[in-house]
Amino acid sequence: MCANKRKEEKPSHIVSAWSKEDGFCLGQKAVEEKSNEITAIPELLEKIQIKGQVITIDAMGTQKGIAEKIKKKRADYVLALKGNQGTMFEDVKEYFKEKGLLKEIQEKGCYKKTQEKAHSQIETREYYQTEDIGWLGQKKEWRGLKSIVMEKKTLEKDGIQK
């Protein structure tokens, strides 16, 4: 989402659908003054072809209705999960703390690690993915939910981990 502000006007916000593979914008939707991107995202999804694609959305857009719309249009989704979904975030967080689970996920090959060096620091991201979600009480509320992923991010600057 980006903002645009002219003198003496309130800023306008725009939700954009971006194709990483092709490197261009597929569509945009202005966010109405007394609204937010939660209402603009479904309207934008209605206007663009997404069949067979994977849609990624930040935590604010992680809504059951948005997931439903994506699945109805025969696409898949990766949605960021934070505290805006009741106990689901805490449930998932606790699950990934289970003893030996992260090692087991690595051994199954459902793990990826990336490192980037910038601004005299090293950023390491580790991703752990599992399809073991039968225990997740909210699973049925999210059409097409197949797996959960945990991202573990660490920063190292001058040899000190943050």
Name every feature range the model reports, one short phrase each.
Residues 51, 76, 101-102:
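A general structural signal for well-ordered secondary-structure junctions
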Residues 65-66, 87:
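Phosphate- and divalent-cation-binding pockets in alpha/beta enzyme and binding domains
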Residues 1-57, 62-65:
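Conserved, well-structured functional cores that handle cations and Mg-NTP chemistry
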